[in-house]
């Protein structure tokens, strides 16, 4: 094949007009669309930044609320334990008071029973003494009336004492 002669620098006219159209398009884009698109992009960027800040604030508030909740829960547990301890102490005190009262009542009952027994003993002694006196008088009358000898009187006295 024969070498073709080509110009050293050749510019295609279609390419030239495409470049001109591109530059005109860039000019109109920059003049009419760049600011609104930049505003929309900046607004979106600012909105995302604000949402991230708000998310961080919300996370911190949630952490703080969690700490407060844990503190309140701990305080409630402590208070519940204190209430239980006070209730147990009160129950123990009440138990002690009831036992003390029961012991006191028992002691009173025992003393009352002892006094009653002592009173009954005294009463029995008085009755026995009066009965022995009556028997002795009766025996003495019989001894005088029958004029018994001393052996018979001693035997009667022994029989009388055995009763």
From Swiss-Prot:
Biological process per Gene Ontology, one example term: sodium ion transport
Protein topology in the membrane: Single-pass membrane protein
GO CC terms, sorted: plasma membrane; proton-transporting ATP synthase complex
Cellular localization per UniProt: Cell inner membrane
InterPro entries in UniProt: ATP_synth_B-like_membr_sf, ATP_synth_b/b'su_bac/chlpt, ATP_synth_F0_bsu_bac, ATP_synthase_B_chain
Record flagged with keyword ATP-binding: no
An example Gene Ontology molecular-function term: proton-transporting ATP synthase activity, rotational mechanism
Stored Pfam families: ATP-synt_B
Positions of transmembrane segments: 9-29
Main location: membrane
The entry's keywords: ATP synthesis, Cell inner membrane, Cell membrane, CF(0), Hydrogen ion transport, Ion transport, Membrane, Sodium, Sodium transport, Transmembrane, Transmembrane helix, Transport
Family the entry assigns: Belongs to the ATPase B chain family.
PANTHER family with a match to the protein in the record: ATP SYNTHASE SUBUNIT B, ATP SYNTHASE SUBUNIT B', CHLOROPLASTIC
Misc: The ATPase of I.tartaricus is of special interest because it uses sodium ions instead of protons as the physiological coupling ion.
Subunit structure: F-type ATPases have 2 components, F(1) - the catalytic core - and F(0) - the membrane proton channel. F(1) has five subunits: alpha(3), beta(3), gamma(1), delta(1), epsilon(1). F(0) has three main subunits: a(1), b(2) and c(10-14). The alpha and beta chains form an alternating ring which encloses part of the gamma chain. F(1) is attached to F(0) by a central stalk formed by the gamma and epsilon chains, while a peripheral stalk is formed by the delta and b chains.
Function in brief: F(1)F(0) ATP synthase produces ATP from ADP in the presence of a proton or sodium gradient. F-type ATPases consist of two structural domains, F(1) containing the extramembraneous catalytic core and F(0) containing the membrane proton channel, linked together by a central stalk and a peripheral stalk. During catalysis, ATP synthesis in the catalytic domain of F(1) is coupled via a rotary mechanism of the central stalk subunits to proton translocation. Component of the F(0) channel, it forms part of the peripheral stalk, linking F(1) to F(0).
Record-linked HAMAP family: ATP_synth_b_bprime
Identification of the protein by name: ATP synthase subunit b, sodium ion specific
The species this protein was found in: Ilyobacter tartaricus
């Amino acid at each position: 094949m024969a070498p073709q002669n080509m110009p050293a620098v050749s510019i295609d006219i279609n390419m030239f007009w495409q470049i001109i159209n591109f530059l005109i398009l860039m000019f109109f884009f920059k003049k009419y669309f760049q600011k609104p698109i930049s505003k929309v992009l900046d607004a979106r960027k600012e909105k995302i930044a604000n949402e991230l800040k708000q998310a961080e604030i919300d996370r911190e508030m949630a952490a703080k609320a969690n700490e407060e909740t844990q503190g309140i829960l701990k305080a409630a547990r402590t208070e519940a334990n204190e209430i239980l301890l006070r209730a147990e102490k009160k129950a123990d005190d009440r138990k002690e008071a009831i036992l003390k009262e029961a012991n006191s009542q028992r002691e009173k009952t025992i003393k009352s029973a002892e006094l009653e027994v002592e009173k009954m003993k005294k009463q029995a002694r008085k009755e026995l003494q009066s009965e022995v006196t009556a028997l002795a008088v009766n025996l003495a009358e019989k001894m005088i009336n029958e004029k018994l000898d001393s052996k018979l009187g001693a035997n009667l006295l022994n029989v009388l004492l055995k009763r």
